[in-house]
Amino acid sequence: MRAVRLVEIGKPLVLKDIDIPKPKGAQVLIKVEAAGVCHSDVHMRQGRFGNLRIVEDLGVKLPVTLGHEIAGKIEEMGDEVVGYSKGDLVAVNPWQGEGNCYYCRIGEEHLCDSPRWLGINFDGAYAEYVLNPHYKYMYKLRRLNAVEASPLTCSGITTYRAVRKASLDPTKTLVVVGAGGGLGTMAVQIAKAVGGATIIGVDVREEAVETAKRAGADYVINASVQDPLAEIRRITEGKGVDAVIDLNNSEKTLSVYPKALAKQGKYIMVGLFGADLHFHAPLITLSEIQFVGSLVGNQSDFLGIMRLAEAGKVKPMITKTMKLEEANEAIDNLENFKAVGRQVLIP
């Protein structure tokens, strides 16, 4: 089968012809119909998430097939698989655990001590077929097609968890930093659907700002031409916001947007751009603000976002579909901030 693989850090991905894996036990072989392109794929190609090196620090073994936003049809199953049939259209939760560690036992499989992350340390979906390690991490699609469903397995699950951690309700105001991207447009929609909060979308390009507005943001700020803090103070009448979801966590965003928080506000840190956090500690105490990390999502988050999308409450904003051979171009678009919404590869 054709597969696009990371062979060497910092180099373009390489299209290879490799063997189709054979499922056994609880494994499922899926014929890939769509694979979303995520900014984590930029970090993988670069070989690091901030200062964390994927090989030396995270234990990734090369070569590896990228692609963790997965939807497709079941091709073959191991003898332990129940509840599914060949030909079923499924989405796959790529953030899997081995099942035995403390975090797996309490339902936080994405924090597993020995994780099985498809497209990271297990071969992913930039290929004609992908081997899913366990059938319990699948969702049988009834209304969504594969292209619509694939981004939900990362951008959807990640922002669903972040919105939950923000503790929103209709009295609250939320800032989404990076609101015009694949994660940002999902965060805006989920926050509206689940929390009913007032949403301020922030981005740095006019096209991205307009995309955030189409996603449902009540207010939008182009931080490249407007003073975001002044605009946030104006919108909130000086109070500040109840939560910020930072999908970048860059030096720039972390130096600006914590200052937008109201008392008892929450700063939800999602992005992996690798900046350090510098904040005057007494202000955390005096204003009772919280800095909260949020990493992808667990199986409950996966089921939650899939059901929300199948009910028509949210929908990924797919802006471009591309061929498998165009994977490097898609990642270039993200790396150079030329992408808005979500790009999806179709093998």
Swiss-Prot record:
Gene3D superfamilies hit by this protein: Medium-chain alcohol dehydrogenases, catalytic domain, NAD(P)-binding Rossmann-like Domain
Sorted UniProt keywords: Metal-binding, Methylation, NAD, Oxidoreductase, Zinc
Modification N6-methyllysine, positions: 11, 213
Record note on cofactor: Binds 2 Zn(2+) ions per subunit.
Catalytic activity: a primary alcohol + NAD(+) = an aldehyde + NADH + H(+); a secondary alcohol + NAD(+) = a ketone + NADH + H(+)
Keyword Ribosomal protein on entry: no
Keyword Thylakoid listed: no
Enzyme Commission identifier(s): 1.1.1.1
Signal peptide: none
GO cellular component, one term: cytoplasm
Binding annotation for Zn(2+) 1: 38, 68, 154
Cofactors named for this entry: Zn(2+)
GO MF annotation: an example: zinc ion binding
Binding site for Zn(2+) 2: 98, 101, 104, 112
Family: Belongs to the zinc-containing alcohol dehydrogenase family.
Quaternary structure (record): Homodimer and homotetramer.
Name of the protein this chain belongs to: NAD-dependent alcohol dehydrogenase
Organism, as annotated: Sulfolobus sp. (strain RC3)
Top-level taxonomy: Archaea, Thermoproteota, Thermoprotei, Sulfolobales, Sulfolobaceae
Gene: adh
